[in-house]
C-alpha cells in the first residue's frame, strides 16, 4: 500500500572516503618523520663541527638529481603514455564486443587522466631515488681534473676514465632504461587500446597493427639504437678494464678483435636505426625487423664468434708472446695506481748474499736495541688490569704503536687512551642519568716503551715481572720524564673515541652542561666536572630536545631535570665515523691511534681517495687485501666508499680532538687529482699540507691498510719482465701468521710497526715491515719496509733475497723454535695451568745482510678472572739456531749474538716506571723497581754491570732445578746486579 512517502537517497559516505585518504597519509607521515628528524639532527651536527657546507652541498646535489632524474623519467613516461592514448583507433571494428581488449580499453579510457598522472609520478619517483645516488659521479664530473698520465691504447688522460667516463655511462644507461620503459608502455598500451591485435590462426584471425603504433614503436626503437651506438663507443674504453686470468686490461683479443667489432657494431646500429626511422615514411615494419635480425646475427658473429676464434687459434698457442705488450701495460698502470712506481720503491737485489757476521749483527744497535717485546694485540688486558683505575674505563682490544724520542734516541711505544667503556657499566651505573650525564668521558693516556718490561719473569707462577713499564699513565701528565718525551697532557679528558662509541645498544651520546655551576660528571673519586668544550649540539630548547628524543627514542631527554638550558648532547663519537661524515668521499683506515698534540689527546685517522678502476690497473678488494689476524682481533673497521678499487692514495690525514670532537682534514698527497677534484666539490674543507704542525708530523704513521694493499700488489708487480710475469715463477706471497690461533692458521701475517735501522743510513727509523715468501713456498723471498719518519716518509724499501740461497721463512722459523726440546718441554709443563700466547713474530733484517726472528711468549693463569698476560720468555731464531730465555739478551747470546756489542744496550737509559702495581715493593722514591731489558728490554752498559747481570741470570737459570734456598740466593744476586746496573746507567 502506498504511503505517500519516498525513501530518502543515501547520504554520501564522506567519512569513509576521508578515512581512505587519511590512512595512507598517516603512513607517509610516519615514514617521513624519522627521516626529517635525522636530517634535522644531522644538520645540527654538521654545524657543530663547522662542516655544514658539506651537508648542504650533498643534500642540494641529491635533491637536484632527484628532481632532474624524476622529471626526465616522468616526462618520458608521460609522453609514451600520451602518444599511445592519442594514437588509439577510433573504433574497434575488428574486435568481438566481448573481447577483453574492449573491456581494457573502456577501463583505460575511463581512468586515462589518472593513469597519465600516476604512472609518470611513480616511475619518476623511482628514477629520482636511483639517480640521486649518483651524486658523487656528477660532482666529480663537474670538478674533473687531469692526471697528466694517459692510457697506452687511446692516449686519453686518466682523468677521462676517472671522472668523465662514469658520467657518460650514467647518461647512456639512464636513457637506455627510459627508452625501454617507453617502448614497453607503447607496446602494452597499443595492445590494450586496440592498436595491436594478436592473430589467432585457428580462428582465422590475422594479427594487425595500426600505422600510428608502427611509427611510435619504430621511433622509440630507433632512439634506443642511437643510444646503443653511444654505448658501443664507450665500450671501447671499458675494454681497458677487462679482467683476465693473468692480468687486468685490454688483451690481445680485446684490442685486435673485440675493439674492431665494437666499431662495426656501432656502424650496423646506425644503419638499423635509420631503417627504424624509415617507418615514419613507409609505415612498414618488415625492413627494421629484417635489419634487427641481421644486427643480432652480426653481433653474434662479429662480437662473439670472431673474438673466440682468435683467442682459440691465434692467442692460446702463443699467449706469452701475444700478451707480452699488454702485460707490460698492466704492470706500468698498476704500479702507478697503487703508488709503487720505481721512484717510490727501492729494490735491494741479492740482499744478504754475503751474509753478516754475528759481531756486525750485534753492533746493529738501531735494530737490536729496539726489539719490540710488547705485542699490542696481546697486552690490552694487561693495560686494562693495571691502568683501568675504574671498572667503567677501558682500552681497545688492539692497542696502537707510536714513537717518541728518549735522550736523543728514537723509541717505539705502545699507546692507548683511557676511554669510558659504556659496555662495562654495571647495575645502577647503567641508569639513564648515570650513563648519559655522569659517566660521560674517559681520562688520560697510557704509554709503555715497547722494548721494556718492569723486570724479568723467571717463573711462570710468579706475580713479579714481565709487565709493561708505563712511562705515562696518570690522568694529567706533567712530570719531568713525560715532558722530555714531549708528552704533556694539559687536557686529559676524552669525550670522543672508538671505545666510548662502541655501545652495543647504539646509544652513543652524552648530555653535558649544567646550570648554577653544579657539576655532575664523574672526573675523579674526589671531584666532578662540567664540560667546557665547544663540541656538542645545544638541546636547551624544546625543538632540539624533542628531535633528539625521537632520534634516540628516549623520553628522558624531554622529562629529565638533568637536561637544562645549558645542556649539549655529544654524539657520533667514533673518530673514524666523524671523519667519514664530514668527508663522505674518503675511505678511512681500519685503525685510529691517539697522540698528544699541543697538550691534547688527538685521534689520527688516515683517509684514502679511491677509484674503482683505471685503464690496465689491477683491481683489488680492500677488505680482502687488508685482512689479517690483527684485523680479526681489533674492534675497528674501515669506512668504505667502495670495496673494489683500482686506484688508491693516502691523500688526507685527519685529526679528531678527543675533548671537543673537532675534525681537521689535512692535504697529504698534493699531487692526487682525485683529492683536487673533491676539494673543488667541497672548497675550504681540506687544509693545506703546510698547515700540519711539526709536532703532528712527528706522529704521523704510514697507514697499515695502504701498506697491506701495496704489499699484495708488490707480491706480483715487483716483476718487470712481461714473460716472467706470465709464468708466475717470480711471484711472491704474503705468509700466513705462524703465531695465529688454530682457527686463523691461513690468515695473513700482519705488518708490524718497529723501530729499526734505516735501510740507507742505518739510523733508528720508525718503520712498518712485512716479509714475503716464495709463491707456494715457505722460504723467505723478500722483506718490505716503509718509513714513517718525516724526512723520508713513504719511502718503500724491498730487500730481495738471492734465489740461489735458502733462508727460513716465518713459518719455518716458528716450526724450528717450537720443535726445540726446551720450548716443547716448558709448554707441556705450563699449558695445564696457564694460557700461552705467541706474540708478534718479527722478521728483522740485521747487520745489513742477515735475518733475525724474534717472538715474545706470554702467559696468563687459567681460570682466574683477574689474570692478565705477562712476558714470560723471548724466542729467537738466527741462522737456523734457536734462542730461548727470559730476556732478549740471553736469547741473543744463545744464537751467537753478543748483546754487549750492541751500542745502545750500553748507552741508552731506561725509563723510570710509574707506580703501576701496588703489590710490588717500592724503592725510596715510591716507585716499583725496574729491570732494564737489555737484559729484558735493550738497556744497560758495556762494562761490568751488564756482565754481572748476565752472570746472575746464568746462576738463576742453573738454580731453577735446585732447592728453593739456592733459587732465592740467585734471585737476590740478580737484584743486586740490577741495582748496580741502574746506578751505573744513572737511573
From Swiss-Prot:
The chain crosses the membrane at residues 19-39, 63-83, 115-135, 176-196, 212-234, 261-281, 290-310. Keywords: Cell membrane, Membrane, Transmembrane, Transmembrane helix. One of its GO terms (cellular component) is plasma membrane. The keyword Transmembrane applies. This is UPF0182 protein DIP0733. Disulfide bonds: none annotated. It is a multi-pass membrane protein. Its main location: membrane. Residues 904-950 are annotated as: Disordered. Residues 928-943 have a biased composition (Low complexity). Belongs to the UPF0182 family. The keyword Cell membrane applies. Residues 904-927 have a biased composition (Basic and acidic residues). It is found in: Cell membrane.
Amino acid at each position: 500500500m502506498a504511503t505517500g512517502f519516498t525513501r530518502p537517497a543515501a547520504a554520501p559516505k564522506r567519512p569513509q572516503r576521508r578515512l581512505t585518504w587519511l590512512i595512507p597519509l598517516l603512513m607517509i607521515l610516519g615514514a617521513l618523520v624519522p627521516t626529517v628528524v635525522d636530517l634535522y639532527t644531522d644538520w645540527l651536527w654538521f654545524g657543530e663541527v663547522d662542516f655544514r657546507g658539506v651537508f648542504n652541498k650533498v643534500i642540494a646535489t641529491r635533491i637536484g638529481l632527484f628532481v632532474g632524474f624524476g622529471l626526465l623519467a616522468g616526462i618520458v613516461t608521460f609522453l609514451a603514455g600520451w602518444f599511445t592514448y592519442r594514437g588509439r583507433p577510433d573504433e574497434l571494428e575488428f574486435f568481438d564486443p566481448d573481447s577483453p581488449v574492449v573491456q581494457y580499453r573502456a577501463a583505460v579510457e575511463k581512468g586515462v587522466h589518472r593513469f597519465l598522472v600516476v604512472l609518470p609520478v611513480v616511475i619518476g619517483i623511482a628514477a629520482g631515488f636511483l639517480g640521486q645516488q649518483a651524486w658523487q659521479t656528477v660532482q666529480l664530473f663537474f670538478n674533473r681534473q687531469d692526471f697528466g698520465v694517459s692510457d697506452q691504447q687511446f692516449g686519453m688522460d686518466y682523468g677521462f676514465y676517472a671522472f668523465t667516463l662514469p658520467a657518460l655511462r650514467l647518461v647512456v644507461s639512464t636513457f637506455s632504461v627510459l627508452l625501454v620503459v617507453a617502448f614497453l608502455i607503447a607496446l602494452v598500451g597499443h595492445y590494450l587500446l586496440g592498436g595491436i591485435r594478436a592473430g589467432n590462426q585457428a580462428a582465422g584471425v590475422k594479427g594487425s597493427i595500426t600505422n600510428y603504433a608502427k611509427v611510435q614503436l619504430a621511433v622509440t626503437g630507433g632512439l634506443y639504437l642511437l643510444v646503443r651506438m653511444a654505448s658501443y663507443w664507450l665500450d671501447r674504453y671499458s675494454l681497458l678494464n677487462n679482467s683476465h686470468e693473468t692480468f687486468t686490461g685490454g688483451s690481445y683479443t680485446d684490442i685486435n678483435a673485440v675493439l674492431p667489432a665494437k666499431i662495426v657494431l656501432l656502424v650496423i646500429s646506425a644503419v638499423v636505426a635509420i631503417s627504424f626511422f624509415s617507418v615514419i615514411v613507409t609505415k612498414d615494419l618488415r625492413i627494421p625487423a629484417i635489419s634487427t635480425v641481421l644486427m643480432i646475427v652480426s653481433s653474434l658473429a662479429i662480437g662473439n664468434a670472431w673474438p673466440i676464434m682468435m683467442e682459440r687459434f691465434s692467442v692460446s698457442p702463443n699467449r706469452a708472446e701475444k700478451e707480452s705488450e699488454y702485460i707490460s701495460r698492466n704492470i706500468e698502470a698498476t704500479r702507478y695506481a697503487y703508488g709503487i712506481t720505481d721512484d717510490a720503491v727501492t729494490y735491494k737485489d741479492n740482499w744478504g748474499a754475503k751474509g753478516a757476521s754475528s759481531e756486525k749483527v750485534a753492533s746493529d744497535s738501531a735494530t737490536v736495541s729496539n726489539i719490540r717485546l710488547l705485542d699490542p694485540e696481546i697486552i690490552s688486558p694487561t693495560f686494562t688490569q693495571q691502568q683501568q683505575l675504574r671498572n667503567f674505563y677501558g682500552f681497545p682490544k688492539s692497542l696502537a704503536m707510536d714513537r717518541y724520542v728518549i735522550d736523543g734516541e728514537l723509541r717505539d711505544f705502545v699507546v692507548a687512551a683511557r676511554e669510558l667503556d659504556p659496555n662495562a657499566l654495571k647495575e645502577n651505573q647503567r641508569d639513564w642519568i648515570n650513563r648519559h650525564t655522569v659517566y660521560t668521558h674517559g681520562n688520560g693516556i697510557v704509554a709503555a716503551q715497547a722494548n721494556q718490561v718492569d723486570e724479568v719473569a723467571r717463573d711462570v707462577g710468579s706475580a713479579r715481572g714481565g709487565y709493561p713499564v708505563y712511562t705515562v699513565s696518570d690522568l694529567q701528565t706533567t712530570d719531568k720524564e713525560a715532558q722530555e718525551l714531549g708528552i704533556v697532557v694539559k687536557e686529559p679528558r676524552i669525550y670522543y673515541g672508538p671505545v666510548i662509541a662502541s655501545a652495543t645498544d647504539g646509544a652513543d651520546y652524552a648530555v653535558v652542561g649544567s646550570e648554577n655551576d653544579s657539576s655532575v660528571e664523574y672526573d675523579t673519586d674526589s671531584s666532578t666536572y662540567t664540560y667546557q668544550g665547544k663540541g656538542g649540539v645545544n638541546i636547551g630548547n624544546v625543538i632540539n630536545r624533542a628531535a633528539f628524543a625521537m632520534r634516540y627514542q628516549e623520553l628522558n631527554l624531554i622529562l629529565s631535570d638533568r637536561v637544562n638550558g645549558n645542556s649539549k648532547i655529544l654524539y657520533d663519537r667514533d673518530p673514524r665515523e666523524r671523519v667519514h661524515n664530514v668527508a663522505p668521499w674518503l675511505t678511512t683506515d681500519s685503525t685510529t691511534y691517539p697522540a698528544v698534540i699541543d697538550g691534547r689527546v688527538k685521534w689520527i685517522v688516515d683517509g684514502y681517495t679511491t677509484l674503482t678502476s683505471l685503464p690496465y690497473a689491477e683491481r683489488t678488494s680492500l677488505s680482502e687485501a687488508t685482512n689479517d689476524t690483527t684485523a680479526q682481533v681489533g674492534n675497528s673497521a674501515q669506512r668504505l666508499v667502495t670495496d673494489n678499487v683500482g686506484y688508491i692514495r693516502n691523500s688526507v690525514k685527519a685529526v679528531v680532538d678527543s675533548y671537543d670532537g673537532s675534525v681537521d682534514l689535512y692535504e697529504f698527497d698534493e699531487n692526487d687529482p682525485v683529492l683536487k677534484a673533491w676539494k673543488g666539490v667541497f672548497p675550504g674543507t681540506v687544509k693545506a699540507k703546510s698547515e700540519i704542525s711539526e709536532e703532528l708530523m712527528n706522529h704521523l704513521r704510514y697507514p697499515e691498510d695502504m701498506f697491506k694493499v701495496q704489499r699484495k700488489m708488490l707480491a706480483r708487480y715487483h716483476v718487470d719482465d712481461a714473460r716472467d710475469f706470465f709464468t708466475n715463477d717470480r711471484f711472491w706471497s704474503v705468509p700466513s701468521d705462524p703465531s695465529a690461533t688454530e682457527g686463523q692458521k691461513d690468515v695473513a701475517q700482519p705488518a708490524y710497526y718497529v723501530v729499526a735501522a734505516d735501510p740507507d743510513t742505518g739510523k733508528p727509523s720508525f718503520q712498518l715491515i712485512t716479509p714475503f715468501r716464495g709463491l707456494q713456498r715457505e722460504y723467505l723471498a723478500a722483506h718490505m719496509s716503509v718509513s714513517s719518519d718525516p724526512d723520508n716518509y713513504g719511502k718503500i724499501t724491498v730487500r730481495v733475497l738471492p734465489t740461489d740461497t735458502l733462508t727460513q721463512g716465518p713459518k719455518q722459523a716458528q716450526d724450528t723454535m717450537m720443535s726445540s726440546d726446551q720450548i716443547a718441554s716448558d709448554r707441556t709443563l705450563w699449558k695445564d695451568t696457564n694460557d700461552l700466547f705467541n706474540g708478534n713474530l718479527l722478521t728483522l733484517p740485521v747487520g745489513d745482510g742477515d735475518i733475525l726472528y724474534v717472538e715474545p711468549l706470554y702467559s696468563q693463569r687459567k681460570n682466574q678472572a683477574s689474570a692478565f698476560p705477562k712476558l714470560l720468555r723471548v724466542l729467537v731464531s738466527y741462522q737456523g739456531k734457536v734462542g730461548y730465555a727470559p730476556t732478549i739478551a740471553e736469547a741473543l747470546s744463545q744464537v751467537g749474538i753478543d748483546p754487549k756489542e750492541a751500542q745502545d744496550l750500553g748507552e741508552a737509559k731506561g725509563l723510570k716506571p710509574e707506580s703501576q702495581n701496588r703489590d710490588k715493593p717500592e724503592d725510596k722514591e715510591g716507585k716499583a723497581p725496574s729491570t732494564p731489558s737489555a737484559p729484558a728490554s735493550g738497556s744497560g752498559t758495556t762494562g761490568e754491570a751488564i756482565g754481572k747481570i748476565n752472570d746472575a741470570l746464568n746462576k738463576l737459570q742453573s738454580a731453577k732445578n735446585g732447592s728453593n734456598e739456592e733459587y732465592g740466593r740467585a734471585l737476590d744476586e740478580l737484584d743486586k746486579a740490577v741495582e748496580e746496573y741502574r746506578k751505573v746507567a744513572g737511573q
